[in-house]
Amino acid sequence: MITMSSFKYAGLIISIIISLISCTHNKNYPTAFQPELAKAEAMMYRYPDSALHILQGIQPDIPSENEQYATWALLMTQAQYKNQIEQSDSLINIAYSYFTKHDNAQRKALALYYKGILRHESHHAEDALSFYLEAATEIEKTNDYQLGFLINSEVGLMYLYRKLNDYAMEYFEKAHHNAELSDNQTYIAFSFIYIARAFSQKKQYLSLIHISEP
C-alpha cells in the first residue's frame, strides 16, 4: 500500500538526485560562460583592456581537459600579453596541451603563437622560432588574417635578426598578404615597414623606392 510517507520519501530521493546532478554540472564549465568568451574574443584586437576585464570576471575552477576552460586560458594569455601584463606559462600550457590534441587550426595556431611569444620573452629563441613556424603552418588552414599577420611577422623578424634576409622577406611578404586580407590599416603599414627593413638589410635600395611609391 502506497502511503503519504512513501511519497515524501520518494520526493526526498528525487531532490537528492537533482542536487547531485546540479553539483556535478557546476564542476563542468558553465554554458553561461560561452557568450562571455565570445564577447571577449570579439573585442580582443581593438579593446584588449575590455576583453581582459570580461575574462577576469569568469574565474573558472574546472578540469583543464575542457574546451571552454582551455579557451579561457588561451584568451586570458592573449589579453594579458596585449595589456603588457607579466605572466607565467601556466595558462598557455593548459591551452597548448588541449588544442594541439584537437582539430581546430585557429585555436592551435593561436596557442602555438603565444607559446612562442612567452618562450621568446624568456630568452629561448630557438624554441620560440619552432613554435612560430608550426603556428605559421596551422594558420594557413584558416581565414584569421590578423593572426596570420602577427605570426608571419614574428618569423620574419627572427630571420631578419639572424641576417637570413631571403627567409625574412618570404615571411614578411606573407605577413603583408595577410594584413591586406584583414583590412587592418595598422598591420598593412607595419608590413611595409618590415619589407623595407628587409630590403635595407639586403642593400636593395632601389626596391625601397618602389615600395614607397603610391
Protein language model features and the residues they cover:
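N-terminal leader/linker segments that initiate helical-solenoid repeat arrays
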Residues: C23-L75, K82-D89, N93, H102, ...
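Conserved alpha-helical positions within TPR/SEL1-like repeat arrays
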Residues: L74-L75, Y81, L110-E121, Q146-Y161, ...
